[in-house]
From Swiss-Prot:
One Pfam family matching this protein: Flu_NS1
Gene label: NS
Keywords, ordered alphabetically: Eukaryotic host gene expression shutoff by virus, Host cytoplasm, Host gene expression shutoff by virus, Host mRNA suppression by virus, Host nucleus, Host-virus interaction, Inhibition of host innate immune response by virus, Inhibition of host interferon signaling pathway by virus, Inhibition of host PKR by virus, Inhibition of host pre-mRNA processing by virus, Inhibition of host RIG-I by virus, Inhibition of host RLR pathway by virus, Interferon antiviral system evasion, RNA-binding, Ubl conjugation, Viral immunoevasion
Record note on quaternary structure: Homodimer. Interacts with host TRIM25 (via coiled coil); this interaction specifically inhibits TRIM25 multimerization and TRIM25-mediated RIGI CARD ubiquitination. Interacts with human EIF2AK2/PKR, CPSF4, IVNS1ABP and PABPN1.
Name of the molecule in the record: Non-structural protein 1
């Protein structure tokens, strides 16, 4: 096993522990707490994959961080912060909407790369809006935290979430996954809309109805599916 992989996991475990202590003092805001929960799932998945104990890794990560901080000057810290690109966290959903449990009458699930797509195929003839919480860098979607599909009544009928055991995805991965979700929901005569925030950063264009323009690959796939059903 690569030593950098192990040490990276150890440092991530310790930094998560620090953030958890911060949250325990009721100092974290909603985006902070949301990332904390997501990262906990990711660390559990990585620990299982690597065969490493999280508690032991946390202690080792603390030693690594302490060694770095001993050599770190205030001036070097300022220069590091100044060189980082600005990262923004955008939220369409409230904390309650993100953490709410939901179930499907006719579940369908598909894994696309490192993203898991889930939808309820029992939903028909509804108006549905897609909302997402995600980070943006250089005016492009950088990391999807969670996307959910809501009916006008507020019921959750679909979801796209990163797989904890497979971290990392691109904005194109997200775009393609949303195309799959939209295609599945529209198949049952639902009308799907996308939030303005998601349109702005996940797509550069949309049609007049507020529906995103699907990527060419997704268009071809949906066209073939439609033709086969006629």
């Amino acid at each position: 096993m690569d030593s950098n992989t192990v040490s990276s996991f150890q440092v991530d475990c310790f930094l998560w522990h620090v953030r958890k202590r911060f949250a325990d003092q009721e100092l974290g805001d909603a985006p902070f707490l949301d990332r904390l929960r997501r990262d906990q799932k990711s660390l559990r998945g990585r620990g299982s994959t690597l065969g490493l104990d999280i508690e032991t890794a946390t202690r080792a990560g603390k030693q690594i961080v302490e060694r770095i901080l001993e050599k770190e000057s205030d001036e070097a810290l300022k220069m590091t912060i100044a060189s980082l690109p600005a990262l923004r966290y955008l939220t369409d959903m409230t904390l309650e909407e993100m953490s709410r449990d939901w179930f499907m009458l006719m579940p369908k699930q598909k894994v696309a790369g490192s993203l898991c797509i889930r939808m309820d195929q029992a939903i028909m003839d509804k108006t549905i809006i897609l909302k997402a919480n995600f980070s943006v860098i250089f005016d492009r979607l950088e990391t999807l935290i969670l996307l959910r599909a809501f009916t006008e009544e507020g019921a959750i009928v679909g979801e796209i979430s990163p797989l904890p055991s497979l971290p990392g995805h691109t904005d194109e991965d997200v775009k393609n996954a949303i195309g799959v979700l939209i295609g599945g929901l529209e198949w049952n005569d639902n009308t799907v809309r996308v939030s303005e925030t998601l349109q702005r950063f996940a797509w550069r264009s949309s049609n007049e109805g507020g529906r995103p323009s699907l990527p060419p690959k997704q268009k071809r796939k949906m066209a073939r599916t439609t033709e086969s059903e006629v």
